[in-house]
Amino acid sequence: MRLALSVDPEEVALLCARWPDAGVESAALAVADPFLTGEHQLLITDRRRAEICYIMHRGDPAEGVLLHIKTFYPAGAYRLPTGGIHVGEAVLETLTREIFEETGLTVGESGDTVRVERLLGVLRYELQHTTLGAVSFATYHFLVQMPAGAVLDPQDPDESIGGWQWRPAHDLRAVADVLETVQVSSRVWADWGRFRALSHRFVATQLGA
């Protein structure tokens, strides 16, 4: 596998063979600068081909899934954590790396590690950008369980994590609403908020929330 595309057919086939209930859905969004071109919104730079999103819970997503906010985000813009998949890097490698960098927790099978429960699905985007033209991207959404008694301890200061929240899964649509209305307080972050809202609605649907 060359692992250069946002959705590599062979890689997705292997993931769906492991988690047969997972599928690929598509979404289209018209966007403009500074989304994809401005500081902190460079989604497709650093050789990123796609991203993972981990939906971390402590035993029951209905009781709480982990959200974070970065120090440079608009006020109140908490969201599900994501991390860029580099060209040549496998989706599951990225998942392991990003969870450790952002939380200090290790993915594995033992009781003191984060357990990957399943792939909820892939959301493929066709972004129509006023400057860049058509841009393809994708988010791979994984449901993972945090080990009992674990403490969140970010390892990479460049992640700039400013805080955490635990929110019941049924709040994810409300979280999406907040992200979509970021444009009211900050036009600079408007398209970023609209884009990020899509993942939260997708996850809410997959979890039946």
What do these predicted regions represent?
Residues 62-101:
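Conserved Nudix-box catalytic region and its N-terminal flanking loop in Nudix hydrolases
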